[in-house]
Design a protein with these regions (language model features):
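Outer-membrane beta-barrel channel domains
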Residues: 1, 6-129, 181, 185-189, ...
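Low-complexity, polar/charged sequence tracts that form flexible coils or short amphipathic helices
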Residues: 61, 147-150, 158-160, 172-176, ...
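Conserved catalytic-core segments centered on acid/base and nucleophilic motifs
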Residues: 101-106, 157, 167-169
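A short, charged
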Residues: 105-108, 141-145
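Transmembrane beta-strand segments of Gram-negative outer membrane beta-barrel proteins
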Residues: 125-144, 165-167
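Flexible, membrane-facing loop/turn or short amphipathic-helix motifs
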Residues: 143-147, 205-208
Length: 219
């Protein structure tokens, strides 16, 4: 292990990874940057398989001890029994394909209730209640011709909300540069899924002139 190799420390209580050394910043909000320093970030590999990726949360009401069957594109993807009253299913396995989920509640007397839950995804979407973050304090690790040691910080946050929405944001900062990004993503069902974000950046050049700009990204 050399001085600059990445040294990961797994923090299972936080489901996060602390990295010291050479690594890369996450690419979900800003472009990924090579760095030499310290980063604390959520680690999806510490989650159960049923909690990885995006899947909608299913809400329903059972009148009795009932069997709940969930299908997508004609295939059964989950089946379980629930007690009488309101229920929530938030641990569906993520699927690669889009397509509304068909929910069937079969009561103990044989009566059946059916309804659909929209499902479509873009990479930024998170499950309801999922909070994903990263914080970096480091030096930019460029190519061998780089002469100046450019120190920077970055922080990002992605939060899964009810009804298929996700909000996210982040900031980057260095001596003569600031950037702020804010965005949202949504599972729109038959209309598909979309994410849109706006980044505002400001920089100061060597002659002390200030420049700023905006960029918008749609996915």
């Amino acid at each position: 292990l050399s001085l600059h190799d990445a040294l990961p420390i797994y923090l299972r209580a936080l489901k996060s990874e602390l990295t010291a050394g050479d690594s890369y910043t996450p690419s979900a909000i800003f472009d990924s940057l090579p760095f030499r320093g310290i980063q604390l970030a959520s680690d999806d590999n510490m989650l159960p398989d049923s909690m990885k990726g995006f899947a909608p949360t299913i809400h329903g009401i059972a009148k009795s001890n009932a069997q709940v069957t969930i299908r997508q594109n004609g295939y059964t993807i989950d089946q379980r029994y629930v007690s009488p009253g309101a229920f929530t299913i938030d641990d569906l396995y993520s699927t690669a394909s889009s397509g509304d989920l068909s929910v069937e509640i079969k009561e103990s007397d044989g009566s059946i209730t059916r309804y659909s839950v929209p499902y479509s995804a873009v990479p930024i979407l998170q499950r309801e209640g999922r909070l994903k973050y990263a914080a970096t304090a480091a030096s930019y690790r460029g190519d061998s011709s780089q002469k100046e040691d450019v120190k920077f910080g970055q922080a990002t946050l992605i939060w899964g909300l009810p009804h298929g929405f996700t909000v996210y944001g982040g900031t980057q900062f260095a001596d003569h540069y600031r950037a702020l990004a804010l965005g949202t993503g949504a599972n729109l069902g038959d209309w598909g899924a979309i994410s849109v974000d706006l980044t505002q950046a400001r920089s100061t050049l060597a002659d002390d002139s200030e420049h700023q700009g905006q960029s918008t990204r749609f996915l």
